[in-house]
Every structure is written in structure tokens, then in C-alpha cells.
């Protein structure tokens, strides 16, 4: 539906860094769902010319999931259609912190001077540095908050909230959000 509407990049919040606080059995179900969905959908996404990217801290995931994530990115790296970004074990605060850590490393290594640090420079260290900032944030399920998602990148995005649950979100609902 996104490609048909001229949308070049879609970022989905699949697993928040805060989700680790859920009960262990629930986290295990989510991890199993994540892995099985990735394995089931990767061929279809590749055939559809979708480029798959993942953002977030991968180190907390099981080795098999990390391997499948890497394989999916490699398999679709040359695709030129929709870029589908999956935020997994991601949090906006984490993204800002990791960007600041990387800037600090470059300052310590004399690759940057403290006076070089600007908002534009920090953009270059964020997870989505090579992609355009989001134009639109859609939150489903009746919640009216951004829940630590793309905090830096959503600064100028339109925010659209709907009571429609994610599994029921369809092209008609997308058209309403885009209107």
C-alpha cells in the first residue's frame, strides 16, 4: 500500500527496548513471533523489491535472530523499492545516547572538535542518518503518545492517532492519515 502511494520509507516499531520489562513468557512469544515472521516474509519482501533495514541494539537478541536479521538486510540490500525499517530493541533515548557516544569517541580521537557539534552533525550519527526524516507518525490502538520512538527524527513530523488496531490498519486508514 505504501509503494502505491509514493511512500519511499516506512519505519515500523516492532519491539521497544522497554519491551524487555514484560514478563519473560511474553517476551519469549514476541521473539518467536519476530523470528518466524521474518523467516516467513523475507522472500516475499525480496521479490517485491523491498529493502529491509533494522535499527536498534541487536546484541540483546538471540544469535539466531541476529543472524537472520543480518541475512535479511544482506539479501535485500540491492533492492530499490520501498525501504522498510524495522525498529527492534530500539528506543529514541537510546538512539540519541548512542549518537552522542559516537560523537564523543570522534572528539576523543581528534576527528572532531567540540565546536563542530551541531544538530546537523548529530543527525549524521543517528540510526536513520542516511534516510529522510519522517513526514508522518501514525500511532494505532488509541494511544496518544510516541512511546520513545524516533524522538530526534520526529521533531517536525505530523502526528496522527487512530483507535484502529494495527492488525486492522488498511489502505483506507492509511489514506485517512495521509489526507
What are these model-predicted stretches?
Residues 1-179:
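Flexible, compositionally biased loop and terminal segments
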Amino acid at each position: 500500500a505504501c509503494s502505491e502511494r509514493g511512500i519511499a520509507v516506512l519505519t515500523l516499531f516492532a519491539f521497544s527496548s522497554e519491551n524487555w520489562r514484560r514478563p519473560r513468557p511474553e517476551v519469549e512469544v514476541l521473539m518467536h513471533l519476530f523470528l518466524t515472521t521474518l523467516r516467513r516474509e523475507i522472500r516475499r519482501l525480496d521479490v517485491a523489491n523491498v529493502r529491509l533495514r533494522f535499527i536498534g541494539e541487536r546484541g540483546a537478541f538471540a544469535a539466531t535472530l541476529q543472524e537472520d536479521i543480518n541475512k535479511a538486510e544482506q539479501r535485500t540490500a540491492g533492492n530499490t523499492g520501498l525501504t522498510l525499517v524495522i525498529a527492534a530493541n530500539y528506543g529514541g533515548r537510546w538512539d540519541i545516547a548512542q549518537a552522542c557516544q559516537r560523537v564523543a569517541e570522534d572528539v576523543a580521537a581528534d576527528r572532531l572538535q567540540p565546536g563542530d557539534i551541531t544538530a546537523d552533525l548529530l543527525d549524521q550519527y543517528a540510526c536513520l542518518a542516511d534516510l529522510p526524516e519522517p513526514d508522518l507518525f501514525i500511532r494505532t490502538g488509541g494511544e496518544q503518545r510516541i512511546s520513545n520512538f524516533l524522538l530526534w527524527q520526529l521533531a517536525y513530523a505530523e502526528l496522527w492517532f487512530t483507535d484502529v488496531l494495527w492488525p486492522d490498519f488498511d489502505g483506507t486508514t492509511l489514506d485517512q492519515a495521509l489526507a
